[in-house]
UniProtKB/Swiss-Prot annotation:
Species, as recorded: Marchantia polymorpha
Compartment list: Mitochondrion membrane
Pfam families xrefs: TatC
Gene: YMF16
Family of the protein in this entry: Belongs to the TatC family.
Protein name per Swiss-Prot or TrEMBL: Uncharacterized tatC-like protein ymf16
Keywords: Membrane, Mitochondrion, Transmembrane, Transmembrane helix
Topology of the protein relative to the lipid bilayer: Multi-pass membrane protein
Lineage top rank: taxon: Eukaryota
Any one Gene Ontology cellular component term annotated for this protein: mitochondrial membrane
Transmembrane segments: 19-39, 72-92, 106-126, 162-182, 194-214, 215-235
Length: 244
């Protein structure tokens, strides 16, 4: 028992060590090219017509915070495949051959959905969101003149939040498959309040204190959870009818 525990702890230590090394190099690389990453995130907004391609900083440390935050978020996105691979290497030796095949399919599906949703969100959804917000920030009459001067940090954070919500949405197919295969739909329904509490806690920390912003941030996640449960129940009932 002690030998098995020591082996597991040694394996965890090795995996964590390589993750920390990779995280350090990735973060420094992302920070070195942070200006290029900021330009990529700002490109959907800069391509809007009749817009001055400039941002403003209202605080002395805002530029530094933007560079550090952008590099850190980019680091996590680049580190995600390596982190998933390390988790896969740690868990696979304890699985049977049939379980490995099933988990490999879920692993590939998760990665494919993640990058597909990320690409679609960045190319199509983010530009349309900023086009809509830009239209609301301009006036068509001379009675009231509103000129949009976006803050770079607020823009980056809002774009990242949209990408984060998209990343969570991308795992819905994987979650549905896991619920159907493990027959844990009832357990998920009973414990879904914990998911609601987690996302409410997340929105209170990472979003503005405005109640409407937090509601808008939580509603898509709540809708996805309910849609996942509804779809899993439909598939479960359909399989029971086929078995009769």
């Amino acid at each position: 028992m002690n030998f098995v525990l020591k082996t597991i702890l040694e394996e965890v230590r090795i995996r964590v060590f390589w993750i920390l090394i990779c995280f350090s190099f990735t973060w420094f690389t992302c920070y070195w090219f942070s200006e290029e990453f900021i330009f990529l995130l700002a490109k959907p907004f800069l391509t809007l017509p009749y817009l001055d391609s400039s941002f403003i900083c209202t605080q002395l440390t805002e530029a530094l915070s933007t560079y550090v935050t952008t590099s850190l978020i980019s680091c996590f996105y680049f580190l995600f495949p390596f982190l998933s691979y390390q988790i896969w290497c740690f868990l696979m030796p304890s699985c049977y051959e049939e379980q490995r095949k099933k988990y490999n399919k879920l692993f590939y599906l998760s990665g494919f959905c993640f990058f597909l949703f990320f690409f679609v969100t960045f190319v199509w959804i983010v530009p349309n969101v900023w086009h809509f917000l830009y239209k609301l920030s301009t006036t068509s009459t001379n009675l009231l003149i509103i000129k949009l001067q976006p803050k770079i940090f607020d823009y980056i954070m809002l774009t990242v939040r949209i990408l984060f919500i998209s990343s969570i949405c991308s795992q819905v197919p994987v979650l549905v498959i896991c619920l159907l295969e493990s027959k844990g739909v009832k357990t998920f329904i009973k414990n879904r309040r914990f998911f609601y509490s987690f996302f409410a806690f997340h929105s209170s920390f990472f979003y503005t204190p405005d109640i409407w912003c937090q509601i808008i941030a939580c509603l898509p996640i709540y809708f996805i959870i309910e849609l996942t449960i509804f779809y899993a129940l439909i598939i479960q009932v359909y399989k029971k009818q086929l078995a009769l």
